[in-house]
Amino acid sequence: GMKLLYSVAWPGQSLYSNKPIQTPADLVGTKMRAYNPTSTRIAQLLKAQPVTIQLSELGQALATNTVNNFLTSSASGVESKLYEQIKYFYPVNAWLPRNATVVNQKAFDSLDKSLQDAVLKAAAAAEKRGWESSERLDKEYLKELAAKGMTVAEPSDALKKEFANIGNTMTEEWVKAAGADGKAIVDAYRKR
C-alpha cells in the first residue's frame, strides 16, 4: 500500500576508538558500545564485548572507561562533542542509515499523470540534493573532528575486509531467518 518516492542516507556509521585500530585483532576483547541487536551482533562478530549504552550516556561511559570504542556517524561525533573524550576515527561506513519518503499508493494512483510525473520529478531532485548534502556534511564533520584534535584515518585493508565479512555474515543470517522472501529481496538487490 505504499510507494517509495525517495531515500537519502545519513553519513555512514564509522568507528571511534580510544586507541589506534590497525587490524580486527585490535578490537578483540575491547568494550564496544551497542545500542540495538545489529550493533550487538557486530560487536560479537568482532569478538568485542558489547556494552549497551545510548548516545546520551556515551560521554559518561567514555569518562568511566565503560566503553573503548563504538560505531556512530561523523555527525554524532561533532554534535555530541565526542572529540573531547576519544581520539581515533576510522570511516568504515559499517552501514548507511537512510530516511525514506513514501506516499500511499492509492493516493498516488488517484493523481492525474501530469501530477504524478511532477511528484516523481520533485522526489528525484530531493533525493539527489539529499545525497549531495549528506556527502558534503560528512566531509565537513570529518574536517571538524580533525580540527578538534582527533586522528581521522582511513581504515586498514584488514579492517575494511573484516567489516565486509561481517556484512556478508549478517546478511546471510538475516536471509536464513527471513526465508524465501528474504532471499528473493537480497538476490534482487545484488542484481542491481
Residue ranges and their predicted role:
Residues 1-192:
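N-terminal secretory/targeting leader peptides
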